[in-house]
Amino acid sequence: MKRKDNKELICIPSSSPPSTPIREENYYLLTSSPIECSPIQQLDLSGSFKNYSTTSSRANGKKFGQLAMQSRIFFDTTDHKKYVESSYAAYDPHDQPPERDVSLKESSNKINPSNFFDSEQITKINAVKKRFPALDSEMIIATLEKFNWRENITIHKLTFQKLLGRGNSTINKSAQKLNNQPIEKSSVDKENAKRKRYVEEGTKQGQKKKPLRVIELSDEETNEDDLLGQSPTACTTDANIDNSIPENSDKIEEVSIESSGPSEVEDEMSEYDVRVLNFLNESTLQEIVEVSGCESKVVEYFISKRPFPSLEKAEALCQRNAHAATGKRKKSDGRNVGRKLVNSTYEVLQGFDAVDSLIAKCERYGAMISNTMRSWHNLFDDKKMEQFLNTSTGSISYEYNSQQPSSIASGITLKSYQIVGLNWLCLMYKAKLSGILADEMGLGKTCQVISFLASLKEKGIQNRHLVVVPSSTLGNWLREFEKFCPSLRVESYSGTQSERINKRYYLMDTDFDVLVTTYQLASGSRDDRSFLRKQRFDISIFDEGHYLKNRMSERYKHLMNIPANFRLLITGTPLQNNLKELISLLAFMLPKVFDNNMQGLDIIYKIKTTSDGDIERAYLSQERISRAKTIMNPFILRRRKENVLSDLPPKIQHVEYCHMEETQLSLYLSVLELKNLVNANRENILMQLRKAALHQLLFRSQYNLETLSLMSKRILREDAYLDANPQYIFEDMEVMSDFELHKLADQYRHLHPFALKGKPWMDSAKVKKLCSLLKKSRPNERILIFSQFTQVLDILEYVLNTLDLEFLRLDGSTPVETRQQLIDDFHTNENYKVFLLSTKSGGFGINLTCANIVILFDCSFNPFDDMQAEDRAHRVGQTRPVHVYRLITKNTIEENIRRLANTKLTLESSLTTDSEKIQKEISGELMKSLQMDGRVDTMDGSVV
């Protein structure tokens, strides 16, 4: 646009700090190249302009950069000669005239940030520049300004753009512009809808209103600044000032708008702007609360005002009505509430897109694996094969081998499905990928892994391999190596600190094929971790791979630092229906694919769950969980017993209901009344109800305070308590159960008079049912008894001693070095009728096929824990039918737990091995049922 005098002007945005002087009589020369000089003498470290002088030196005139455009000065392109003469009049005539830069790129490279930014801002610029060296300085500065110099948010945004394939295109656009090359508009830009941005110019009291000056940019310039959805057509704050220079200097327009009210400026909504706006306009209350993390009251008010025509309208409503929504007074004006809702939603959506982008990288590898497995179709049924087929082209050259390795010990023959597993492992290794061997418990995963390592050695691959296992299975792995392939040279890395020091020196001078160690040592001390890293293993195998589900844990990070060419995870549990855990497993298996890209996923891990629900329940996450599982299929091999084992004996399930007697029932009802207390803790009440259904000795009802006072004084006569404080002892006794106090009295001579009379440990509904089952068992039958609680195992020891039955016990307190010996003793010595085990320690990774009866004394919240325990006996090598007995106390909370656990097993949306999550869900449902009716059925059918 031209003025009446035919002069063309370009006007620069003018929302500068209050200290910035405005000199409208000064004109700058504007050509197709950047401005040559600036009358601004210098810019202090705080970012404010100092008074300029026309007598400044030429050196100060060189202190010019892109940010000089932020000064509130007009440019007259027609009178530029007059301006040049006046601006150089005071310069030293002996100095050479300032050189003109011929390109924007050269000018931007000459910018010295120290002249325009303080030290903190310079540090942030360098941090972003180090992370994204391909971006030029002006792009980095503009992005930092957009996000108020928050470098973490800037890096996240740039990372997402890079992950989604937009970062490179943006950089290319910038490079094209710098070289004066034509720029093509992306398809996303063409599809973006126009939107209006309402901008308010804030003015302080007593401050003069400043004219708004707008630069009209060409399409090419709009594309260049479209990095993160930012539109450069209009901005009114320093953080959003456009720093680009119009290439067509003939089109210059002067616009003067007062800042007393909002102004409408045409802008384009970015891809994410449209998605966020649609999400906020269409999603439910719970979904917005889960994603944004805002309070329900704020979101309710927000929803009541929908739909919103723009994100700015949504932000403004939340900002202006935050107090009305919450009903609370705060020092701030509440503007951050609305900003948090929109920004949090924006970041979460980008986080999910980052997940999609990373998962997409796995599709190519999955296609190669599945296409190779087409030739194995005769080994799978059609339905199973469909899960592996992919329409993508490309495959891996691999010939299926139906023979087992010749180095496998004589007398051992791999089953057909194990041969398939061996070939799958070899295929993944040849493809330089990684995988998860997730066969159901008892199908011989250990045997398949050992055969895989033996096969590699026969092919001439003489490398070292690492096997990381839980402490309870270390001895079993060593025995399995010796049993299946004695030709493999296997070493164990375990023992005390001094023993491990000697072991490290020994291993440095020893040739071995496989090193077996535990999770505790592999992620423990610095010396152990350093030793394992220096070994440069070819293959790293991780038993019970679900231990690596948390990418943020120290264990995960330490194990990830152990270099390996191939990683294999072994697990017998189903994969978690949890986006974070699926991504963690993928990242651990394929670190090269995920390298330098995981930072963008941190937002997913920072999503806070609310009391109203869990982020994994939102549809946003569900569709990606489904896709992640589908893509992971080629990297996972999972078979079930009923599909591959025709000769495995059946597993027969029994549910034995136990009826409480009067004493136990009275105790249970008294605990049930606690739920009516105002300050009652939900989790504590549920635990107390479970204890009451198990055994009354788990409470303190027979030892009163007077008795405890006497016991605390008498115990001082014992040598172990000569110097003890009786008050402290009394306080400890107050929180002990009747059975713990009885054990204490039974242990120390001076407390014998306080021991319980008779055999009260036999007076429990479940104990009586257990005794009945033990008496019915045949002489040649061996029995495994599992319990969640070690104190229950203590009671069962007294029960078995009363029945005069020999038994063994293994729980979390059992030393690692003695666990395998206990298992061997149970296998070889038939005098041991019963093996007592804790569900957590004894339910994973051990082989107890010599037993054919499994008794679950109490059920776990997580049904998969119970299934693991059952399969200690029902696995390869079992020759007899396995009977599983679940003891359920009738008309108690145990029935509810069992019913809800069965529901979890049948619902695909709840296939998870996260015990804490399942316990939280079941606890909530149980408390709701208790609060609704507050009733309990007695043993005779009446209702209390």
Swiss-Prot record:
Residue ranges, compositional bias (Acidic residues): 217-227
Catalytic reaction list: ATP + H2O = ADP + phosphate + H(+)
Helicase ATP-binding domain location: 426-592
Full protein name: ATP-dependent helicase fft1
Pfam families assigned: Helicase_C (PF00271), SNF2-rel_dom (PF00176)
Molecular function, one GO term: ATP binding
Comp. bias intervals (Basic and acidic residues): 92-108, 186-203
One Gene Ontology cellular component annotation held by this UniProt entry: chromatin
Binding site for ATP: D439, E440, M441, G442, L443, G444, K445, T446
UniProt lineage: Eukaryota, Fungi, Dikarya, Ascomycota, Taphrinomycotina
Keywords: ATP-binding, Chromatin regulator, DNA-binding, Helicase, Hydrolase, Nucleotide-binding, Nucleus
Species this protein is from: Schizosaccharomyces pombe (strain 972 / ATCC 24843)
Subcellular location: Nucleus
SMART domains reported for this sequence: DEXDc (SM00487), HELICc (SM00490)
Helicase C-terminal domain ranges (all copies): 766-923
